């Protein structure tokens, strides 16, 4: 394994795992989500093009991907800096920043935010969904993709010496594309060499997470060091959830704070409320999976920042944890979900 064995790699350099503290395993601090812009419904064009303001906040909450301005989180560095200070005051220690190639990863910005806030920030290596892959990326061999991912972890990414500490979020569509399959294979090969954590964005279908795990396994990936994101918008049947849980990955519920009537990317999905998310966590704990759960907000649009009336990065610590404690999840189990499980996942083998 690598010289990073036993360490966690942040944008400021390696640290001891015990330094992490409470960790949000899936967030974005600076990015663009324009790749996934969704045209507004007929009649909504005017509000979609309007600046973000009080009178359209509810519309934005229901249609977050139909406003170009809302998708430019990279414009809000000052607001994010303030949020990180609040996150630290609320007891937060670390944020895993999941922005990869294709959605405006900005490691120098993350490094500056880490210095100014005192929050540990971990950068992500690799590639997002096929829609963000360049033609050059699509033409690369698995070996070339592997070399790039390894280099982003060991030497630095995007022409900097700032090193990533996790591979991902690695983006997968439904159905998964050939280019995404190559990236998954490269991810598994890089993980084998580095002993590092991996985090996956699955396609929006209940069968997607299991298919991805099988592809990673076939390529030699370590599922025990892999997080499957977005389960709260992907698997809704408890039986199917338990079948997937048996495959051994970390189970991530990472859309806390996002409560919307219609989910634009899959209208068949009824986006759960935070109360339903907590209920799902309690179910998994009851079924013996407390050592596999991690949670986050996956903030990726402006309207979810407190500057715009959103819940912000401290929502879980301030509001969700008390709810968890009232719904049958004890403090030891909460600490596993927020501290112990992320620490185990993020530590290089």
Swiss-Prot record:
GO cellular component, one term: cytosol
Domain of life: Eukaryota
Cofactor: how bound: Binds 2 divalent metal cations per subunit.
Main subcellular localisation: cytoplasm
Residues the record lists as binding a divalent metal cation 2: 169, 201, 230
GO BP annotations listed: catabolic process; regulation of appetite; taurine metabolic process
Reaction catalysed by this enzyme: N-acetyltaurine + H2O = taurine + acetate; N-propanoyltaurine + H2O = propanoate + taurine; N-acetyl-L-methionine + H2O = L-methionine + acetate; N-acetyl-L-isoleucine + H2O = L-isoleucine + acetate
List of residues binding a divalent metal cation 1: 26, 28, 169, 298
Regions that span the bilayer: none
UniProt subcellular location: Cytoplasm, Cytosol
Pfam families on file: PTE
Cofactor(s) required, per the database record: a divalent metal cation
Keywords associated with the record: Cytoplasm, Hydrolase, Metal-binding
InterPro entries: Metal_Hydrolase, Phosphotriesterase
MF term (GO), any: N-acetyltaurine hydrolase activity
Family annotation (CDD domains): PTE
EC code(s) of this entry: 3.1.-.-
Biological function: N-acetyltaurine hydrolase that catalyzes the hydrolysis of N-acetyltaurine into taurine and acetate. PTER also acts on other N-acetyl amino acids (Met, Ile, Leu, Val) and N-propionyltaurine, but at lower rates.
Protein family: Belongs to the metallo-dependent hydrolases superfamily. Phosphotriesterase family.
Protein name: N-acetyltaurine hydrolase
Gene source species: Salmo salar (Atlantic salmon)
